[in-house]
Curated annotation (Swiss-Prot):
Spans through the membrane: none
SUPFAM superfamilies with a match to the protein in the record: Glycoside hydrolase/deacetylase
Entry EC no(s): 3.5.1.-
Residue ranges the record marks as coiled coil: none
Annotated organism of origin: Xenopus tropicalis
Glycosyltransferase keyword on record: no
Binding site for Mg(2+): 15, 135
Name of the protein described by the UniProt record: Carbohydrate deacetylase
Amino acid sequence: MSQEPRIKLVVTGDDFGYCPHRDKGIVDCFHAKAITNVSLIINGSSAASAASLAQRYNIPIGLHANLSEGFPVCTELKQNSSLINGQGVFHGKMGIRKMLSQGLLDMSEVRKELCAQIKLFCELTGINPQHMDSHQHVHVLPGIREVFAQVLEEHRIHFTRIPVELGLHRCTWLPDTLMEFYKGVEEDALNAIEVFRSHRIRWPELYIGLSTMGKNMSTYNIQEAIRYGVCSWQSTIATLPDITNSVSIELMTHPGYPSIPEDGGCGEGPDDFSQSLDRLHELEVLKSTSLQSFFLGNGVQLCTFRDL
């Protein structure tokens, strides 16, 4: 990749605050310079201690808005709200999408919950979120994306995530059901672009993380995702004047030491994703000398959102 433009890579550790084991792994990755940034899940069981860790170690931190797992933060919405089911918890990754498709979500309640999560984030960290994305990509869903963009602009949060991974169609190792979900996420994300732009929200030019999650994370897969993304980006901007010869990328990651039963989660205990050894696998790949050598030898500069 010697002929490629300079690459600025934000490596985000998602789900910070989900449980102490995950948090320790994320902090270890930060100390190893394997991630540059974390995204705090504010209704996670260890959100307060995670925020303290970020302050102690000066870890750049944003908000991982959560409307799909666990309990709401907004007190007003804990008892009777379109955002929760009969057990008082959010509807889940697919459940919120079903509720939305049926027109059953009250967007004024979405606004209240997002604002409550930002308020709690500021109370715990002492700062405004440096960026704001979401758990399970709900921020790009129709209806929610408009409210999300308005809330970010009002709170002067300038960066978000657009989960569109160039080259995803080439990833034949992904199961059909997962690929179908990812394609839906990408379609929603593409439709969110103009909404976010209209509210002066920014994001890195490229995104990686769908094809490299869990057991699918490897130095090779990350290399190939970067190579394909950069080549596609170069082709797109080749005919445009006054484009700088650098490109920014966000790599979404979920490293950590696996959760143990009954310890962690967002009020319902840790899910299978968090208890999986895939979390440890991601940690080991991110810290590997092979990946770090690839970055060093190919003009990849690790950075934070503030560096963009």
